[in-house]
Amino acid sequence: MAIKIENKSTIKLPRKTEETIQSVFDVVPKEHTRGLSKVVLVDRVIPDTRIQMPSNISELPGIYHPKMGNAQPFCEIALGTLLSADGWLKRIAARLNFRPNLAYLALSLQAQHYHLTLSHGIKKNQYEGAIRTYIDRYHKIWREQQAGWRAKLFKPIQPLLDKWVRKLKKRYAAEQKRK
């Protein structure tokens, strides 16, 4: 079952926005999205009176609304934060990075839903790490499915690049330890 996407935004969406969100939710197992009713696209996140939140909530790119009473859980994505309107260069950069940022945000909201409602045995102080690893795992799968010719070209040398990155991180940590 596809998750319903409601567009309540006045901002002009980049093309294939809804397809991107659906492709992200297609990567995640269906059991993990059970109970999540919809994804709402809005201009800015509006504070919910049912939940205590900080004052700078309007700058958040998205928020997960858990089940409360009869209201089903849903996700809210603020397009005004993802699509910057500040300057010409920032607008271009925001448009170029929109799909991966939207995918990562949708995965993070879905991971919050999974870990808060369906996953058991995780303590409150362990949620952030568990959600981050969950997002990274499924974002990598989504990226590989969306990959073009460049990713297919670099796929054979990816283990070599990963080994090189680990070696550089180790060297950097050793230098920081010496200082």
Regions found by a protein language model. Give the residues of each.
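An active-site-proximal "capping" alpha-helix that borders the catalytic cofactor pocket
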Residues: N125-I141
